[in-house]
């Protein structure tokens, strides 16, 4: 789907999706899709939502 990017509030714990950046920083909370949406948000949605 879309590449997940960490929100500013969660910039400390970077939760990137597979192949996005360093998978070593991947957290279990971001592994699941439901929690991933909370910590990371799709890139195309952030720009298309308020533009």
Curated annotation (Swiss-Prot):
Domain of life: Eukaryota
Coiled-coil boundaries: none
Keywords tagged on the record: Chromosome, Developmental protein, Differentiation, Disulfide bond, DNA condensation, DNA-binding, Nucleosome core, Nucleus, Spermatogenesis
Biological process, per Gene Ontology: chromosome condensation; sperm DNA condensation
Cellular component terms per the entry's GO annotation: nucleosome; nucleus
Expression (tissue specificity): Testis.
Any one Pfam family match given in the protein's UniProt record, by short name: Protamine_P1
Transmembrane among keywords: no
Database matches in InterPro entries: Protamine_P1 (IPR000221)
Gene Ontology molecular functions: DNA binding
Annotated disulfide bonds: none
Keyword Oxidoreductase: no
Subcellular location: Nucleus; Chromosome
Family: Belongs to the protamine P1 family.
Function: Protamines substitute for histones in the chromatin of sperm during the haploid phase of spermatogenesis. They compact sperm DNA into a highly condensed, stable and inactive complex.
Assembly notes: Cross-linked by interchain disulfide bonds around the DNA-helix.
Protein name: Sperm protamine P1
Taxonomic source organism: Hylobates lar
Lineage of source species: Eukaryota, Metazoa, Chordata, Craniata, Vertebrata
């Amino acid at each position: 789907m879309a590449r997940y990017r960490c929100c500013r509030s969660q910039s400390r714990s970077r939760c990137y999706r597979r192949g996005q950046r360093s998978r070593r920083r991947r957290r279990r909370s971001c592994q699941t899709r439901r929690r991933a949406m909370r910590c990371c948000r799709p890139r195309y949605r952030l720009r298309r939502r308020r533009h």
